Amino acid sequence: MSVKYLEKYLNFEVIVTLTEGGYIRGILKGYDQHMNIVIEDGELINEREKIKIGSLVLRGAAIVSISEGEKF
């Protein structure tokens, strides 16, 4: 996945698959050349629950994939 790929998702809801398992759903607000991303209105989603976490920065190394947002 290249950094240019993320440009089309700026200010839209995305689903981020994490290397440790689970997902983050939120609005993509920014990114850098290392694939670190800024999410607003974030929600951690795993097999058992959904946890609202607000704004956060995710390191590129913790990300498996980023896709268009969808309902869980």
Functional labels for PLM-detected ranges:
Residues M1-F72:
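Conserved RNA-binding domains used in RNP assembly and mRNA/RNA metabolism
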